[in-house]
Amino acid sequence: MGFLGKKVNGSAPARTTRAAGQAGEDRALAHLTAAGLALVERNYRTPGRGGGEIDLILRERDGTLVFVEVRSRGASAYGGAGGSIGVAKQRRIVFAAQHYLLRWPAPPPCRFDAVLIEGDRLQWLRGAFDAA
């Protein structure tokens, strides 16, 4: 038995949500860098409460800054990985990106992508949503 009497499969401890998220981000980062993007920053958070967080910030070869939301799910139930990136989540990501871009004297072209991981399947959605 594991935490709160929940059965744990096998002898290894149950993975935490944070560890699973980190593993998903690692997998997404490997996929994106193999596709030619360069890592700029990871897990950027705005200061204070109510802000946003960006899982990965990468740069395309043409200079485009790419803000990436990574979502991992074991299966496609309940809308799958993509179903959890609602309008409110998109707003928080856009807010964090705007905050991040304050450090740039002349912000480069930007894009919001999503990497959806469901089991062994990885899907990269370029331009998953807009800042508008």
Curated annotation (Swiss-Prot):
Gene3D superfamilies reported for this sequence: 3.40.1350.10
Any matching Pfam family: UPF0102
Annotated stretches, region: Disordered: 1-23
Domain of life: Bacteria
GO molecular-function term, one example from the UniProt record: nucleic acid binding
Family label: Belongs to the UPF0102 family.
Descriptive protein name: UPF0102 protein Ajs_0414
Record organism: Acidovorax sp. (strain JS42)
